[in-house]
Amino acid sequence: MAWHRYFTWAYEQTLRNECGYKGYQPYYNWPRWSDDPSKSPALDGSATSMSGNGALGCSNQTFYGIPTNAAPQIKIPKGNGGGCVTSGPFKDWSVNLGPVFSDSNCVPPNPISNQTDPNVGLGYNPRCLKRDISSWTSSQWTNDEQVVDLLNSADIKTFWYNMQGGDPAFANNFMGVHTAGHFTIGGDPGSDFFTSPGEYS
């Protein structure tokens, strides 16, 4: 969690100091749009959004899983996207890093794909930004009830488990708010924990 806070701060500093941005980091109310994130101003594909969903793609895959043995039962149904982002300011965005650990069979493998290589996923691998916005994920794990439970956690341990998906991880098919954020956006690199910073939303 500390890493995410630092990353968000560094991102905001870069916007201000290198790009001339005068405002503050916008706040996104996850529960407000949990029924359909693609209708939020942040993801509606308009010129002021962070672009929209990907084109319909990857028809040979009917669901995505969380790429870890800790969550074999969580199967995320394919949404209405999966292909390249086609609208908004980042429709021509290029993703170059990864994949490292993706469950999508629609992502071209990285030139360094041997899982025993310490540089796995670090080879130059240019491709389009892909998204498969999942209201199935957001409606279950970023809704009002989940966020209130998280904020009302009695201690840091409970907060951590509510954020990350339980103890043990993903017990009872519980994804947690943090993991759900990744898989609400989905696609590539959004659903690859190791390269997800390349998904700017």
Language model feature labels by segment:
Residues 1-201:
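C-terminal accessory segments of proteins
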